[in-house]
């Protein structure tokens, strides 16, 4: 899972399609956004575009437009800009008023008409792709306006109660860095009022998450309500200053931060807690699917299209999931027999969940083991990859305050300016529920060759617009992550039957998602039925399974992307191998998949078909040796 769609649902959320606004987890930062288009449309470049300029001029105009758009989007989403290393708006939050949101929507709708006046035929092939992706994203965003997802800005995976985590993503090197953070602390009460206004409207119109997941939030808010300002998570940057900041400034900054927290931050959390417990939570649904929201069936079908980048219906996805579950069961059975277990598959699951030999005793041991796995994986990448990213990554624990309520692990992308490496966050809560046999598959997914390799490579691509370099499509990003787990076999990393079973467990986990996500949100399953199906088909710990099901409840449709994307990548790999025979080279195939950045699955298919045609046409004196 990804942090910029992942935990700006706890400040950078599980992978969604683009980055997610930390002040509103459900709003995907479209990076192609309306008012930016307006900014371009009002610029000199717009006239050239609308007058159908020659290819060179049209390309320059489009490039200038994308640059202007990126800047505007960052200005509208300051926390996102800060997370990417852009400090220009470090002293503020987004405007989350209803008026600002409605203005944005109006601009987006108006802007699409202006954007389509750009003559696509005058653009190069590469810019035509950029144009098409931008236009498709914009149309998808407009299609989603009717669902008013901005009215549910808080879930157990993030919202106001996790905004302090932005501080962990920032550099505090100068006096201004600290002053900017203090300015943000002082403006938090206004942000809380705006978000609570949205929540009130959501409760009134039944656009909110179900009670079962919202009930986790009061305990999270409680961790923000401390007796002294110095105990607040927002005070953390002031506990250690760089040597370059004089003592006098340190004292002044520390005093200002304490005053801002005492006078504004703590009262805001107290007010949020009262409203949440007394009014918001009681208004929530008891059932779990989005089918009960206004236009719920249409909303879920929209989310399925958005996250999978396909036209598959929820029913088709459900049936595909059942088929995959049956296939993977057969492979699990074979591994169980290989280790000599005498019993049924459910009994083997119980052994894997409970046998002490499969677990570390302490969080410290678990973290050390994750870091050792990373060191083992890295040198094996060259076996299956030709191009590797320059940006490093680290392995870090998930913050204690959210670990009980979140998933097994997630990834947070590097800063755009290179000031922060990628981070593979691992959950150390209850190590007795985190089996050794799952750790390799999990690490391959979240770090390398999964999310870190794919996202860091995309960020290092210099020839695509920023909205593509730092954005993504759930089906591509998470499909790649799941596909990366299977590469452990080519890399020689599944060197015992249990780690291989762990890989199958993780594949089964994603197949189960197709069934339970559509089950709850389309077929009206209750939560317990989803938990029971998961428990019966995958040996993950019950605590993990419950957290996963609750994640699907508050992130409808996102979990569909993993298996759908992985199946497409494997289909294209098989197609390429069949077409190229001895000329098929796995490392070059991976370049063909990754070096255009994240794209919708239909675009990926066109890219690979073009790569196959080019490879077939190329003359070579020495045929390549076929690789698996």
Predicted regions and their residues:
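Bacterial N-terminal signal peptides that target proteins for export
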Residues: 5-11, 19-33
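Intrinsically disordered, low-complexity serine/threonine-rich segments
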Residues: 6-7, 11-13, 43-46, 624
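Bacterial N-terminal signal peptides
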Residues: 30-43
């Amino acid at each position: 899972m990804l942090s910029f769609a992942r935990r700006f649902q706890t400040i950078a959320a599980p992978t969604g399609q683009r980055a997610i606004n930390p002040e509103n987890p459900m709003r995907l930062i479209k990076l192609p956004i309306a008012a930016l288009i307006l900014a371009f449309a009002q610029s000199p470049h717009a006239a050239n575009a609308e007058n159908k300029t020659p290819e060179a001029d049209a390309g320059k105009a489009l490039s200038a437009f994308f640059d202007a758009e990126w800047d505007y989007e960052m200005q509208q989403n300051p926390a996102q800009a800060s997370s990417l290393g852009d400090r220009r708006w470090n002293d503020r939050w987004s405007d989350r008023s209803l008026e600002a949101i409605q203005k944005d929507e109006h601009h987006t709708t108006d802007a699409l008409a202006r954007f389509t006046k750009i003559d696509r035929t005058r653009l190069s092939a590469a810019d035509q792709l950029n144009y098409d992706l931008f236009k498709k994203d914009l149309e998808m965003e407009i299609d989603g306006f009717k669902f008013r997802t901005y009215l549910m800005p808080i879930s157990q995976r993030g919202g106001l109660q996790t905004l302090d985590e932005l501080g962990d993503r920032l550099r505090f090197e100068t006096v201004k860095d600290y002053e900017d953070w203090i300015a943000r602390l002082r403006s938090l009460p206004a942000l809380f009022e705006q978000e609570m206004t949205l929540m009130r409207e959501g409760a009134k119109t039944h656009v909110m998450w179900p009670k079962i997941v919202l009930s986790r939030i009061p305990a999270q808010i409680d961790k923000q309500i401390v007796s002294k300002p110095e105990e607040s998570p927002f005070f953390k940057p002031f506990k250690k200053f760089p040597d370059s900041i004089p003592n006098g400034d340190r004292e002044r900054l520390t005093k200002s931060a304490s005053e801002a927290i005492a006078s504004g931050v703590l009262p805001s959390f107290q007010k949020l807690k009262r409203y949440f417990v007394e009014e918001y939570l009681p208004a929530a649904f008891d059932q779990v699917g989005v089918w009960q929201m206004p236009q719920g069936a249409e909303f879920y079908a929209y989310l399925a299209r958005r996250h999978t980048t396909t036209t598959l219906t929820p029913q088709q996805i459900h049936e595909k999931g059942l088929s995959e579950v049956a296939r993977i069961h057969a492979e699990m059975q074979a591994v169980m027999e290989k280790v000599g277990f005498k019993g049924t598959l459910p009994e083997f699951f119980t052994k894997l969940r409970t046998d002490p030999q499969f677990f570390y005793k302490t969080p410290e041991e678990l973290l050390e083991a994750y870091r050792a796995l990373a060191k083992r994986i890295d040198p094996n990448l060259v076996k299956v990859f030709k191009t590797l990213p320059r940006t490093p990554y680290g392995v870090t624990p998930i913050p204690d305050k959210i670990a009980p309520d979140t998933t097994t692990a997630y990834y947070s992308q590097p800063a755009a300016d290179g000031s922060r490496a990628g981070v593979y966050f691992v959950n150390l809560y209850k190590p007795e529920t985190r089996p050794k046999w799952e750790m390799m598959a999990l690490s391959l997914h979240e770090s390398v060759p999964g999310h870190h390799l794919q996202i860091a490579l995309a960020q290092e691509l210099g020839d695509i617009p920023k909205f593509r370099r730092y954005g993504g499509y759930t089906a591509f990003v998470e499909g790649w992550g799941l596909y990366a787990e299977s590469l452990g076999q080519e890399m020689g990393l599944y060197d015992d039957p249990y780690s291989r079973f762990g890989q199958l467990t993780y594949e089964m986990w994603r197949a189960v998602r197709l069934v339970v996500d559509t089950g709850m949100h389309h077929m009206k399953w209750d939560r317990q039925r989803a938990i029971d199906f998961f428990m019966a088909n995958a040996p993950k710990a019950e605590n993990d399974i419950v957290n996963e099901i609750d994640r699907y409840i508050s992130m409808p449709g996102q979990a569909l992307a993993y298996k759908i994307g992985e199946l497409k990548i494997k289909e294209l790999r098989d197609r390429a191998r069949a077409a190229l025979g001895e000329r098929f080279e796995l490392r070059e195939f991976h370049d063909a998949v990754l070096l255009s950045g994240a794209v919708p699955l239909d675009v990926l298919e066109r890219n690979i078909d073009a790569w196959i045609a080019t490879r077939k046409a190329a003359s070579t004196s020495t045929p390549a040796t076929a690789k698996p």
